[in-house]
Amino acid sequence: MPVVDRREFGGRFSVSENSKRLSNYRYLEIQLMEMLGGWCHTTPQLAFKATFGYHVYDHARNADLLAERLEQLRSGREREDPANSDFARLCEHVWELASTVDRLVAVYRVLEPHLVSTYVYHADATDPLADTPTVRLLHQLAGVDQSHIAWGQAVLDSLTQEPHERRRALDVQADLEQRLVACGGVTGQGIESHWLAFASAGEQAKPTRTNPGRTVRRFTKRCAPLDHPAVEPPFWFSDDPAEHRSRYGADQQPTLDGFRARFHQLLYGEVETTDRMGKMLAEFPELPWAMRLELAHQMWDEARHIEIVAKVVEEELGGELGYGPWSLWWWMQNEEDPLRRLTVTNCWAERDLMRTLRRWRREAEAEAAGTRIAELCDYLQADERMHVRLATDWIRRLADDERQRELVRWGREAVARIEGFYAGDEYEGADDVRFTFMRDGGGDEHRGPGVIGE
């Protein structure tokens, strides 16, 4: 049988138009990454936080793949442009939505469905032979984002059980869709109706593109300072050391009760770190893209850790979530300096957590907790090592010697505040605390980890 190749040369997009469209797509992928990341700490449901971590990393990877194709098309690798100021205003409007349902509607019923539809149209309309890399890429991105849409629809169905809730969600959706149509969609060229099988585009002229010039709108995302992330009941926060001691016990031995207390406290660190990675992605777009991609990867890791640690507490250790308080360390995440946010959390706390997990693993192998706990500790420790390396490498790269000394001074003050909370009047201070970006490697093995978390 002869091979029949039904593909034909020719498409609706030149190399220049192709790259402009990919730049528009990359802008929206990054906007979605920043929105979900920045909303995470004000979203109470742990299941939503965890899924946001997955989706944030998906959008970051999508943006990175688009950057690779942009470079191949002789365009700037990190180019990401809104088609026009009206589309940027739409994204700003979505960012400022306050309720969880409204945010989910905006992302999973309006923006991502539109993006998937546009990807499919572009893949169908471009040259299938000369532009095969773009076709393959857009089919891949459409599949990833379509999986997000399915999750979002299921969640919205569960959150809008009452008729008035569904009507309100539909009203929000209609308003956003109207704004989307008015601004011309992600490309500014209108909403393509490629799914109408009977409609022929053969005689239609190629869509025109308006040059937005250098005045296209850009906006900065900022999150209001909070005392702690939003969490759903039964989780709660306390700044009273006595409550922590009474719920968890002062001496956490490697027993079933001891491991239960350890992992319940660790869960807070996983939640906070998921939230803080997302917040950094939203608030610091000026950071190098390679660094932001690593931050998104860490957010995904921490989101997985939420699932792992919560499951360990409930299913492996027989505990109830929320039986003990979480600490109030979120004030560090209100710092205007992104490197300060990483200094204590990644370059001190996560380094200490690596040691803690190594000790837990050895104790679990020897005690009743069993090999399952030991294996999980080993996997968690492997992830933490990458998070420590991330911050260490980037602080050394971005901060000169004087700034690193300032980070050490600030970091020691922050560590003293944290350790002093648990140690009380007997605390001797944090003047000898080391951080991993310090030129000696930050080694302070003589100090025992006094805090569980990140």
Specify the residue positions occupied by each region the protein language model found.
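Non-heme di-metal
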Residues: 2-454
